Amino acid sequence: MRLHHLGPDFPEALVDELLEGNVVFLCGAGVSAPQLPNFRDLVLNVYNRLGEERTPAEDHAFQASRYEEVLGALSRRLVRSEDVIDAAAAELQVPANPDTAHHDVILRLSRDQVGRPIIVTTNFDTLFERSLMVSHSAAFATQESAAGQDIPAPGSARFTGVVHTHGRLTDDELNLSQTELVLTSAQYGEAYLRAGWAARFLFDLMRCRTLVLVGYTANDAPVRYILNVLEGDRERFTDLRRVYALSSSNGDPQAAAAPWQALAVEPLLFDPEGGNPYGPLWSSLEGLANLVENPDVRRREMIAAIVSGPVSETTDHDIRTLKWALGARADLFEHFITRCEDAAWFDTLAVVIRAFGERARAWMLARWFARGWDDKVRYLTAIKHLGRGSQEFSDAVFRELDQNRPQDAIWEKAWRLLAEAAAAASHDSLRDYQLRHRLNRGPVVESDLGHLVNAIGPRLTIEAPFRDEDPSEHPNQLSDIARFSMESEHQEFLRDVLASPAGNAENILRLLERGSQRLSCQLRTARDAELIGQVRDVTDFGVPSVVNHQQNQHRRGFVPLTVFITSALPMAAQANLEGTKRVVGGWRAEPFNLTTRLWMHALTHQALFTADEAIEALATSNEAAFWSFALEFVAIVRARIAQASGEAVERLVRRLLVEGPQRYADREQNADGIDWQDRARDRDIWVRLTAISEHVVLPQEAETLLHEIRERRTYLSREIDERDLFRTWSSGVRAVRGRTAQIVSAQPSERLTIADRLEESSDIEDREGWVEYCREDPVGAYAALRSHPLEIGVVARWATWLEIIPSRANMTSPEWLRVIQEAVELLGEADDEIVIALVGPLARIAEHSRQLQLALPANWWDRLWQAAEGEPDVDWGDDVETYDRVINSTGGSLAEALLQAISSQRENGDDVNAADFQRLQRMIVSMTYSGEMARAACVRYLSFVFSVSNEIALDHLRPFIAADNDEGRRLRGVLVEYNSFVADTEISFADLILQGVRESRQKDVSAANAASHLVRAVVASFDEPNVVRGISPQQARQTLREAAADIRVGALKIMTNWLEENPDDERAAAWTDLYGPTFQAIWPRDRSYLSNDVSKEVFSLATAAGTAFEAAVEALLPYVSTFEDDWLSLHDLERNNAELATRFPVAALRLVWAACGPPCKGRTSDIAAILDAVAAANPALAVDRRMHKLRLLAVSH
């Protein structure tokens, strides 16, 4: 918390301690400056006052800033040693009109829990008492002053006022006498060492108060004595409080902090201000005093100042301050809500808000929404929080809506639907599985039937508009605000629930009733959400079939519920016919398409309706039922019309003949002249009359009409196809595979022409025809290519064919190999224009020439490289790794081809061709995009390149790797992330390897690869101590210190993986001889390098040591910090039936306790087996209290 732009950044923990009255300021001479001298000036003034000169010994101590030793030496050589004390007392007398502004501020800050001032000072002067005299009275100041060995014990009732640990001077105005002073080295030794009363006082003080040093430098004598005493105690006593020091940065914060950090003090640095170097300190302390005295006022000011602006314009310091201001103060969130405009603050403060519980979070959000019901940003924020939906959130929004209704009706509806959606979103899948278990076990209770249909049925879902659909400023309908839909979960575990006891005769009717009620309720919600309107019904359109059908696959929404209802229908009719008819009658009475379709489906069941009843009901149904639902219409006809009476059939056909020709008569013709009304009318009549004609003879009039339609629409002159009954038809998901029939059936000379024509097709499979043909018959495709002259117009066809050659490297048929060789020779003679156009695929063929057994033309590489150098740069973006770019580039492929050619020469025992040396050098120094890619490929195989020519590697390639530019950094990344080095290469490139490791920001496997160079070098130094390596253990350790955290974690992973590669019976020796020493040699010992990720990897490393597990635990335990994850993985110790815990129970318990002991709050399913193994192997440990605490983390599944 920074209260001045140049002032110290006060930790929030310190501010909290100040508010609790748990902080004591320990004040030095700087507090009284410049009125009184500091220790250095005091020494100079004492010498002047006494008329003495410093001896060489005294001057040596003076130059070392050991002023207490200077005065000690002086007092020893004076005849009257008291002269030193008297001279110092004279120099430190309080001025006639003292300025106590600094002391006033500190007295406001340094107070106990009940507000009494408590200051500890090593100053002899009484300026603090003078400040108390002004603020209280002279008597109070006198009473509250204590000095020397009469100081009160910290924490006691008397521990108040001004405590002079080094003594106090006389103050006649306050009637205070002088006490023994601690000024010389001998007196310091007495107070802190021989008698030790000052040391005991400070130790007790540190156990009950946080200490803030002000007015000192790190080299001041009081600081050195005090903190050396405390540091010794801190190693043995864990309850010592923190020590802070207020100090100037002097323009170099790092250098200023170092001396304090060496004394285990947290420095709070301020920057000096021109003309008033200490102004920022005292201004900050005054601001801190104002905060401590009026915390609520200051909290409110901070909140208002910070949240009135957007999160994007705030600093980390601002956010930290805001979190402190709001922390543990739910009453201030109303203040936050009234001033917050940026929704991002809720994400920024998510952890703080969550600490108050779900109910408070919901209230905060709802209150903020209510301040701007018609604000689209607030609504979109609410949508984001729907994912964490809860009943509390729903209740809070409804409550605000009731108390403060939106002015706009559309917005009110949107918010009410959102509140409803929030309640539905709180659905818990785990409860569904528990429900299934209860339903299978029985008996089934009524509430579980309700839970079942609720789980199957859809719920309202609200999503933000697509990115290119910003919400309207003045919405006229809900879709202007957000995307509303009805969605259901994938409830596969409930698919066959009707076969469980829930589907028994005594339950099935209630299930049907509850399902129908749920359907009706959710349809009304959908209507409220404007998903059902006069013209459009999204719910109906989203259900291809109300019965189980392939077209329902991948559909959600209302599909599961409607299929569940139709599946339960025949079972319910068998169990209770009259009750089922009553439910079906309810469907017909509902004003929804889906319920109408369910009623129509019920007409197909003989148990519910006679054939005449079904056909009569269909004939007299409303317009939507009769004309809109072809699938259900045809299903009724096919199931019932054959058994129906002639009269019933006649009435049905008559309605078709009367109403059919009038369909769409009121619709206007399209402007484009397409007679869609006539076509749609013909199709509606055709599908219905055709379905009827399948089972009965149509009347002549109907037959004539059907014939006319078939004549008019020749595409309808057929039987009904199933897809005719659906408004949309899905053919399923399938891979796109080029269609080659037309190409294959043509003559070779015609195939390219056909391929060109197919490429213009609207069918993607036609467009992919040539590509697929090249894959299916590459020899035939080559024949087609050869039938045309090698010209620029056919280059695209050649490119496609050439690109498939590398993927056919395993084809060994003589014909195929002949064709490739012939193609290479042909293209080797091609014009430069052709080579340039085909350089990419040709380079990849060169790269795979060995596998393809190709004899490349002598000038092949040179021509391709010349063409490659003309290629433009490729913008890959920041997401593509450097080496991924290389392997997909022409330059990278040609580099690989050249290196392979050189390797073949060496494998055959030949000297490397001089021309290839020249090519390698030419490629490396090329300042083109292809040159950059080729250099990266050479860096990937640096050890090989170095072995071929260390001159080329060092003189030409190394400068590019060492360059301080983007390419240099990318090359160093390839160097360390994709390589392993022999000793000679490591020695020559050690500095760049270390730099690459320091620069790497990779994670996971790539980070481990980078770290492996450090580990490999040090392991090798222990394995083969006589072999010189390029990276020493000291360099490896320093590099790990400077590298990213992921690199350090990667180093541990590499050690674990390599250790586990050893056979089980060799792991102990590998740990003892290699990996244990390597860890001790390279791992930083600073506590600052401990982390949760490090701790987890150290845990795994210990378990990889095999029978050396005890020794590994002993060595690694200091580096295991408490795990911080919510879910803990102890599998490395639990595997193989907790074998290590059985063999080494004490070590296993120590390791698990270090990782999972307090304050760990995670849970794990691994720990029970480990603890059981420990207890079984060593029964005495069963009563160990660590075991009891660790068992609290166990989770059983």
Curated annotation (Swiss-Prot):
It holds the Pfam family SIR2_2. Keywords: Plasmid. InterPro entries: DHS-like_NAD/FAD-binding_dom. This is Uncharacterized protein y4cA. It comes from Sinorhizobium fredii (strain NBRC 101917 / NGR234). The lineage of its organism: Bacteria, Pseudomonadati, Pseudomonadota, Alphaproteobacteria, Hyphomicrobiales.
